[in-house]
Amino acid sequence: MYIMKQSGWLELICGSMFSGKSEELIRRVKRATYAKQEVKVFKPAIDNRYSEEAVVSHNGTSMTSHVISSSAEIWDHISESTDVIAVDEVQFFGESIIGDLSSLADKGYRVIAAGLDMDFRGEPFGVVPNLMAVAESVTKLQAVCSVCGSPASRTQRLIDGKPASYDDPVILVGASESYEARCRHHHEVPKKTD
């Protein structure tokens, strides 16, 4: 199926955990819906923290979504009448999402993606840096540091209340029981070498 629209683009919303990425994605989707645009919302199957079927922000705002295991599945859910495609937790998808989202924008869709730009180690996370490079618009949000109240750009993983080691697995789906927002100065990663 080849679908061509008037104009398309890719918007990326990124930042640390608790910075409001999902909330901003939901806000943009609601505005598109108010404008009578047809919207399709997607999230990765791995993200089941708050709901199996919905994109849910940490403050409880939610929106029904299609749960997919691979970005290729997006194509199965869209049609010529679709105007906007929104994808939450984009960092959990493989490299193919970069090409899929770019192709969707090339075909005229407004594509909104949201995800973590850094992992708990403070390093670029998955596909997000490459999406930042190809997006027409990048919005980087900040949370509030749980230690000092300064703007927080990092995600602190905690294990039994202590900072996780650099050697721990990068992906661990969780929320406030496992993570906090931290500023540059209070972000700790034991065993990290500079």
Swiss-Prot record:
GO BP terms: namely: DNA biosynthetic process; thymidine metabolic process
Q: Where in the cell is it found?
A: Cytoplasm
Q: Which Gene3D superfamilies match?
A: 3.30.60.20, P-loop containing nucleotide triphosphate hydrolases
Grouped into one coarse class, the protein's main location is: cytoplasm
What highest taxon heads this organism's lineage?
Answer: Bacteria
Q: What class of enzyme is it?
A: transferase
Q: Which residues bind Zn(2+)?
A: C145, C148, C183, H186
GO terms assigned for molecular function: ATP binding; thymidine kinase activity; zinc ion binding
Of the GO CC terms on this record, one is: cytosol
Q: Does the keyword Transferase apply?
A: yes
Q: Which EC number(s) does UniProt give?
A: 2.7.1.21
A Pfam family reported for this protein in Swiss-Prot or TrEMBL: TK
| Annotated catalysed reactions | thymidine + ATP = dTMP + ADP + H(+)
Keyword annotations for this protein, in alphabetical order, are:
ATP-binding, Cytoplasm, DNA synthesis, Kinase, Metal-binding, Nucleotide-binding, Transferase, Zinc
- Which PROSITE patterns does its entry note? TK_CELLULAR_TYPE
Tell me which SUPFAM superfamilies the record gives. Glucocorticoid receptor-like (DNA-binding domain) (SSF57716), P-loop containing nucleoside triphosphate hydrolases (SSF52540)
Instruction: Give residues annotated as binding ATP.
Output: G15, S16, M17, F18, S19, G20, K21, S22, D88, E89, V90, Q91
- The UniProt entry annotates the active site at E89
> Could you give the subunit structure recorded for this chain?
Homotetramer.
Family named by the database record: Belongs to the thymidine kinase family.
The protein, known as:
Thymidine kinase
Species:
Bacillus velezensis (strain DSM 23117 / BGSC 10A6 / LMG 26770 / FZB42)
- Give the source lineage, highest ranks first: Bacteria, Bacillati, Bacillota, Bacilli, Bacillales
